[in-house]
Amino acid sequence: MIKNLLAEAQAYNGLEAIQSLIEDGQTLSAIPMQPLYVASRALDASNMSALLPRLTPEQRNVFLDIDLWKKDDLDPDRFDYWLEAYHQCEVDEVKQEFINSSEFYLFLKAIFNVWTFDVEDPNYPNHDYYFLTDDSLLLFEYSEDYEQVLEAKALIRELYAQKGVEHAYAYLFKLVSDSYSSLEEIEYKEKKERLRDYGFVDYYEALELSLIHI
């Protein structure tokens, strides 16, 4: 999908103008989605964090829908970029939108093994690659080569601050038993419908269309 977007957007006469709008801090709400996304792809996570509050919720959501998937699979590696961008974002409303999103929940399920934890009868992994939530009721275990632990932990802490301990625990507790494959399938179908509303065609739909014309 991204390759197609790049090709289409390069033909858009206002691409350089959009990049100027991004750099100048002007409003972006009326800019067509495809060229806006392409113009923003050159930004590092720090600059994207400053851009996020200037986007509409719909624009932010479409950016994630486009960027986080390889065909019908979530791409956890690409998620690291957005994790850093939202972690650095200074607008609480935007950050809270992200940590309450289904994408963030699915990301946590993809990266972490989540276990209940009993402080009176603690059961720790036999390695150091884990952390406890601030209420010490959940243990998040991760692979030794995962590098975005501090950012993920900080956003989980934000979730607790927003929802309160009881509701945050109840929300994250579902990670213990939820099926990743089922969650991913549901999210893929929902993101496909959202993108279709903006005129985007996903990989498999594009493949079907190309086969029809062979």
Ranges and model annotations:
Residues E103-V201:
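Extended alpha-helical scaffolding regions
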Residues I212-I214:
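Conserved small/polar residues in nucleotide/adenosyl-binding loops
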Residues I2-A50, R54-K109, W115-T116, L132:
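Alpha-helical scaffold segments
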